[in-house]
Design a protein with these regions (language model features):
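Membrane-embedded and interfacial regions of multi-pass energy-transducing membrane proteins
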Residues: 1-347
């Protein structure tokens, strides 16, 4: 039987929650893709067709758009749990695969945000393609031309439909590595203090799945447009620009980084490095940095300071990139880098 730590808490339930939500997204996305038309003249009206004429089309659309937020909430909580308890020191390959899944999920979410072809979708695609112009030769391949057009939507649709296959494969490897190395336990409890996965943790995961299902049904039933942008309900018009082009809330942290760096290429590199540095935790940590936050007082407070800075970046991401907000964003970036370096070195 698969041995699991006896000291697991509810933080260990986020893995199965995020996995179940990802597969829910794959199922609803497949059903929606059967009726979607990847063309700039038909994409918006195909979404309206799904709403009004496809049986349970509005339900599929609402579930697919609403579950995206819980996916990133559970994935980020799952990732922060591994950092807090020092899992990168014991199951490094598992964490590396998890970071790969996180990056692929970000790409899928961005591609999916463009497909409804509302006003915010169009200008969001324009901003990101301009950002990718810092890499030579990428923009003509992504756009299929010199600007965002029908080939762009077709490419985004194909990539958005193909990447979930890569995600499911990465999740399989993630679980295989986990079963080979076993889950990490809270530091101080010992590695031999373990119990069988069945039946104790099966019941625990089942309770977590039922709780997540209740929360998801509540959001789909009562708060489906709570996190939506009103501008994205309007059809694309190149003559109309939203007052502020804002991505989904789970991208606001990275959007605040881009607005804080004046150079386009440098901002892109900082944003990529901001994510990739998570892969270096297992190798770059000093001996004192390998300990989890529960046994290291300095890392304990550093982790909470980093968490507060991330919440602050979400607020910064919705502000206009002007005046004092640029300075605030640079201050956040400095604090965040200091926290990450301090966490690696164990102070």
């Amino acid at each position: 039987m698969y041995p699991c730590p006896k000291s697991t808490s509810n933080h260990w339930n986020m893995g199965i929650l995020s996995g179940s939500m990802v597969y829910t997204q794959v199922l609803t996305g497949t059903l929606l893709g059967l009726h979607y038309t990847p063309d700039i003249y038909s994409a918006y009206y195909s979404v309206i067709h799904i709403y009004r004429e496809v049986y349970y089309g509005s339900l599929y659309r609402y579930v697919h758009s609403s579950v995206a937020s819980p996916v990133f909430t559970t994935v980020c909580t799952h990732l922060s749990r591994g950092i807090f308890h020092g899992s990168y020191a014991y199951v490094y390959s598992v964490m590396w695969m998890g970071i790969a899944v996180f990056l692929v999920l970000m790409a899928i979410a961005y591609m999916g945000y463009v497909l409804p072809w509302g006003s915010m979708s169009y200008w969001g695609a324009t901003v990101i393609t301009n950002l990718l112009s810092s890499i030579p030769g990428v923009v003509p391949w992504v756009c299929g031309g010199f600007h965002v057009s029908s080939p762009t939507v077709s490419r985004y649709y194909i990539i958005h439909s193909t990447l979930p296959v890569l995600t499911t494969g990465s999740l399989v490897f993630h679980v295989l590595y986990l079963h080979r190395l076993s889950s990490s336990s809270n530091p101080g409890y010992g590695t031999n203090n373990r119990i069988h996965f069945y039946t104790w943790l099966v019941h625990k995961d089942t309770l977590a799945l039922v709780s997540g299902l209740v929360v998801t049904i509540t959001q789909v039933s009562y708060g489906v447009i709570m996190l939506a942008h009103p501008d994205n309900t309007l059809e694309v018009s190149v003559l109309y620009t939203p007052l502020h082009i804002v991505p989904e809330w789970y991208f606001l942290e990275f959007y605040s980084i881009l607005k804080s760096i004046p150079g386009r290429s440098s901002g892109f590199l900082v944003m990529i490095s901001y994510i990739y540095v998570l892969n270096t935790y297992g190798e770059a940590c000093t001996p004192s940095g390998l300990a989890g936050c529960t046994v290291h007082t300095g890392k304990y407070y550093t982790w909470y300071l980093l968490s507060v800075s991330v919440l602050y970046s979400l607020w910064m991401g919705v502000q206009l990139p002007q005046g004092e907000y640029i300075s605030y964003g640079r201050g956040y970036l400095m604090v965040s880098i200091w926290c990450r370096v301090g966490y690696i070195n164990g102070f």
